[in-house]
């Protein structure tokens, strides 16, 4: 969708305000490769797209990469594969991974298909606490009340439903902080079972 592509938000300025420069980033973890999730993978320099984080490893599901490559000509992803992914691959900065993949002692990437074939979730462990980044496995908090509801963008609706329930049940079992990308503020929530659905306790 054009509304999610080539936007001029002060993202790098916000990163700098947090004390991080692009050259200091070690990893870029990709839940999936839709254009609204890969916009800062590259930036324009002298009329061409170059990696925004020149010293980082961009970790991408191989299944997701293959799916995006096969549909590169589709109009619904705004040329993101050509402009946002291939410059990273051509620079030798991509790590294509299969199945569960760990990074150090704190990060674990696990398959979470449905929204796209190679969509993943990312667990961040910090001592006794942990959080779960779920990408586009959910788009709205209403999906806690109605976990079988999909967005119109889920490529495999049945798998998306099963994945969503699995991720929510994981958060309940391990008291993991749910970290969705599309809810808006306050962004993070604990999850409780509520009958056949789920309730959220959003963080202040």
Report residues per predicted region.
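Cap/insert and terminal regions of metallo-dependent hydrolase folds
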Residues: 2-13, 127-204
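Metal-dependent catalytic neighborhoods of phosphoester/phosphodiester hydrolases
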Residues: 38-48, 190-191
């Amino acid at each position: 969708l054009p509304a999610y592509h080539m936007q001029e938000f002060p993202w790098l300025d916000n990163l700098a305000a947090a004390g991080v420069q692009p050259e200091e980033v070690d990893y870029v973890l990709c839940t999936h490769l839709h254009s609204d999730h890969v916009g800062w993978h590259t930036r324009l320099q002298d009329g061409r797209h170059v990696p925004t984080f020149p010293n980082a490893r961009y970790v991408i599901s191989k299944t997701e990469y293959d799916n995006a490559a096969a549909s590169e000509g589709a109009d619904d992803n705004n040329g993101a594969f050509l402009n946002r992914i291939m410059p990273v691959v051509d620079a030798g900065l991509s790590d294509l991974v299969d199945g569960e993949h760990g990074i150090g002692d704190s990060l674990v990437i696990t398959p979470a298909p449905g929204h796209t074939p190679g969509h993943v979730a990312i667990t961040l462990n910090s001592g006794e606490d942990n959080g779960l980044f779920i990408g586009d496995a959910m788009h709205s908090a209403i999906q806690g009340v109605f976990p079988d509801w999909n967005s119109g963008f889920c490529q495999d609706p049945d798998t998306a439903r099963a994945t969503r329930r699995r991720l929510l049940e994981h958060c309940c079992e391990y008291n993991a902080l749910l970290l969705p990308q599309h809810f808006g503020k306050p962004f993070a929530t604990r999850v409780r079972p509520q009958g056949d659905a789920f309730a959220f306790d959003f963080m202040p």
